[in-house]
């Protein structure tokens, strides 16, 4: 019996060693780094990438134009999301095939970059990228030099952008601003007027934010305040986990030009916050070490509402901005020149404000309690420095930013609706419209509906001088691709794209503003009809799309992680061994 048990023990020991040696799952980081890859070359690689690009583009382009369709996206929490926003649709796509997903992810990058730079035009960028890449793939497969194709594409894009810049129109009136916003909000005139009103109230350099409202109607709130591009120093300060931001009502503000690391420096401010039962926001060059640890600990224990933010700017500019904040909040700025140290702080030295919102990237201070006279005096002081002939252009730019933040207001558009889904969809449209309007004010407008790109195809590429035949093909690819947005808009309206685009590029080629209103189904002067696109949006979409898609065309090898191989199933429990009458594992 003893011999059988020892024999069985040795068998189990050997089995466990083998299992440990061949264990397929739970690879550590070092093992994963050396996991084998899967490669595809040449035509096969580009075909797979194109398949992924086509799949994503098909989903995104269905939203383009006044009669574009909505897309329903599953949400990991809450209700599904309904949207017509191109970048939202693009980001939601994840393909099963890894090579196809490579192409889709590059197109997602195009959409995201365009959205980041221009705030709109993501669907147009997707349409252009797909058109340029698909034609590039065909020509490379036919034997063209991909690098020459890319050079031709880049030359044509530069010529098209020059043509658009020569024919742009600056916008000045509130009516034109409303038209741009209306188009970007998919024809919603109410949203257009709301954004136009907000821009009039805070000025073109003012700050406008969009939030989800709690009523059925949209609301516009304009409040005096300041925004700067610094966020919370630690995510532990977040009060709204879903929105990933800190929101305080009536906080106290501690302003310091120096780094804060010692606990003694913040104890008086923390005590004042506790005594007055008000949140505390520390704005300093930096907060670190024990001081930061104490703030986080107090916040996590729920003993104190506190947050820390790095002061905006650098050097002298930081000192000036902190001075602005001091005037705005009626607080003392602790500097090297000030005789009083932080540990001697009294509650009356802390600034105060109506509310503050802090995200990862920026901070908005509303209703600062500084006196109107002090703020006006500070603004005059800034204007005086700007008027000084010795002030450089760079310094004037920074001073203008400070003046706008100090004298301008903050407009908050609260989007209303009957349900969470409706409010979410509408908020996407309002954000798009706001971004497009800012872009239009910045660089001017063009006739919308893809018309400007159509006219660039007809008239803007005549002076491009390619060095060889392959570069000429690159120019032809762009000439064809930039007609695609207009064609897609028309086709999404259920009309024949080829006929209408043909008429616009032949009969109306010399009339820059003449285009097709897909909503009404008629040829009109697009500017007069209020159908416009910001130059910045069109330019950014074209440049980003051509850059990535022509680079994709030069791809010769695609490499992805190979799928994990499933190892053999772990051996089951040892049943009774032969002749042992099924002695169970209970003996071990």
UniProtKB/Swiss-Prot annotation:
GO CC list: mitochondrial inner membrane; mitochondrial intermembrane space; mitochondrial matrix; mitochondrial nucleoid; post-mRNA release spliceosomal complex
Subcellular location field: Mitochondrion
Induction / repression: Up-regulated when grown with elevated levels of potassium chloride.
Transit peptide residue numbers: 1-34
HAMAP family: CH60
Described function: May participate in assembly and/or disassembly of proteins imported into the mitochondrion. HSP60 are ATPases and have affinity for unfolded proteins. Involved in osmoadaptation.
Family of this protein: Belongs to the chaperonin (HSP60) family.
Name of protein: Heat shock protein 60
Origin species: Emericella nidulans (strain FGSC A4 / ATCC 38163 / CBS 112.46 / NRRL 194 / M139) (Aspergillus nidulans)
